[in-house]
């Protein structure tokens, strides 16, 4: 394919046939075209009316457009490729729309069709309009389904497209997104372990807490050098120890107040249940809210009762 656009080169600008120029039958039973869209020859190729799937070309010059050799991802090289070819049997057809110098394997048929579509005349305008300078760069696209990176690179000399498929990698779009997969533990940073203190460190910290519940910055630095701990670890230990001390003191206060209240309640209930009794000279007086009852012994006379 030349570097000039199809507006300059008349070969890329198709000439449409007139309304009267249609297919017409020949005495031999074949059908011929009235004119070719990409050639100046009036009659170029014919089609056989037989049931054979292969295409038969007449002795007339074929209607083909010479394009640059294209190298495909699946393998194989295509030369003398027509702008309207691509639907026949590549392995058996040797004439007709175009000829192939090397057959393409069936496994790479889809790749070759895609590459042929890029090199066809329908897409030739895009490559020609962009020019060699702007079409040399790589075009990268991330497919939505699998995340495979497809890059199409164009060489400046022969302007053929080669598709390079990179291996699919299921990577997250942003670094802060969670990583899913079998190797999650290896990629994610190791979780911070809980700090364990030795008996010596705990004893020194307890002694310091007994004298000072709050440490100054200077004393905290001294303890960090003495015990081999960081200032942050010492600060957190003192915070936890103060919370523990507050909880213990609160429980003690609740326990002491509960015992005192229990003793007072027992005393009050005992006094309420006990009935006040008073004996004066052998007379027992039972106090009741409704009336006063006197029990007089037989040995005591009425004088004693009057005296009371």
UniProtKB/Swiss-Prot annotation:
DNA-binding region: 190-249
Subcellular location: Nucleus
Pfam family, one: Homeodomain
Gene3D superfamilies the record matches: Homeodomain-like (1.10.10.60)
Main location (coarse class): nucleus
GO cellular component: nucleus
GO terms assigned for molecular function: DNA-binding transcription factor activity, RNA polymerase II-specific; RNA polymerase II cis-regulatory region sequence-specific DNA binding
SUPFAM superfamilies found in the cross-reference section: Homeodomain-like (SSF46689)
Disulfide-bonded cysteines: none
Region (Disordered): 247-280
Gene Ontology terms: biological process: anterior/posterior pattern specification; regulation of transcription by RNA polymerase II
Top-level taxon of origin: Eukaryota
The protein, known as: Homeobox protein HB1
